[in-house]
Amino acid sequence: MKKLNNKVVMKNALARAQHELKLTEKRIIATAMTKINSKASKLDYKNEKARTIKINANEYQKTAKLKNTKDAYRDMMSAATELINKQLKIKRRTITSIETIKINWIESTRYEAGSGEIEICFTQKIMPYLCAIKDRFTEYKLEEMAGIQSIHTWRIIEFLTSWSTGKEGQRTISIEDFRTMTETAKSYKTADILQKTIEPAISELEKRGWKINYEKEKTGRKISHLTFIWRKP
């Protein structure tokens, strides 16, 4: 199977946002991002046709590391149906408060049973986060995500990469911001976040050559923040 080598590029604000995507949906969005020219002008993507991306079952199969394209296409059709209703949330600090911006990922989707491919059309509102990028951006190869089994792991990689200096980095994040950024269930208590989100993700990352540790910080008796220290392979 041919290796994936296309790059996913997005502004840091998007990498650190709340995506509200399942793993199958994330694979489709990330694959579509590799087909966007991150250096192109926003005007180049004003036209709906330019924002419409085709993804075939072979591409999805490589990212998910599935055994066959039949399973890949099944997952793609199911995810495409859900994607039309998904929004990302970006928090931005103003002079007096913190505002939340909600943006739909896609405005339309199309697939034909048995065709082996789907089409998605990114919304115009999301394009400023995907193109005309000169600085403050997150970049990684799609092949780095091939076979990832948890959306938490994928989102942690994006978050840490957005704060990396070269291959290394250190960043402190509040428990609540970490919860929303990694799509962790609201019902999870702090102990659950550590045991069911962070530890499995670290295990998966270490198998991929990452060196990563985290420290817990308390406010009073409660763990309120986490500090991650990492080195990418």
Set out the residue ranges of the language-model regions.
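Charged, alpha-helix-forming regions
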Residues: 1-233
